[in-house]
Amino acid sequence: MRCVPVFVILLLLIASVPSVDAQLKTKDDMPLASSHANVKRTLQILRNKRCCITFESCCEFDLK
């Protein structure tokens, strides 16, 4: 019966160890853009292309 508490403690310690996916960031790591930002950017490009075909004066390629 003495082994049961030791076994439980070992299980708790193993569960609290960070997984392989938890890696430290380096200075070269860039945060990934969210899917919302990607959709917004794509819609902006398509809107500008459609606008340029119809009215050349409204052509803007100002992507932020």
Curated annotation (Swiss-Prot):
Main subcellular location: secreted
Tissue: Expressed by the venom duct.
Processing and modification events after translation: Contains 2 disulfide bonds that can be either 'C1-C3, C2-C4' or 'C1-C4, C2-C3', since these disulfide connectivities have been observed for conotoxins with cysteine framework V (for examples, see AC P0DQQ7 and AC P81755).
GO CC entries: extracellular region
Location(s) in or outside the cell: Secreted
GO MF term list: toxin activity
Propeptide, chain numbering: 20-48
PTM sites of type 4-carboxyglutamate: E56, E60
Keywords: Cleavage on pair of basic residues, Disulfide bond, Gamma-carboxyglutamic acid, Secreted, Signal, Toxin
Signal peptide region: 1-19
Cross-referenced Pfam families: Chi-conotoxin
InterPro entries: T-conotoxin
Keyword Magnesium on entry: no
The record's note on its domains: The cysteine framework is V (CC-CC).
Stated family: Belongs to the conotoxin T superfamily.
Official protein name in the record: Conotoxin mr5.3
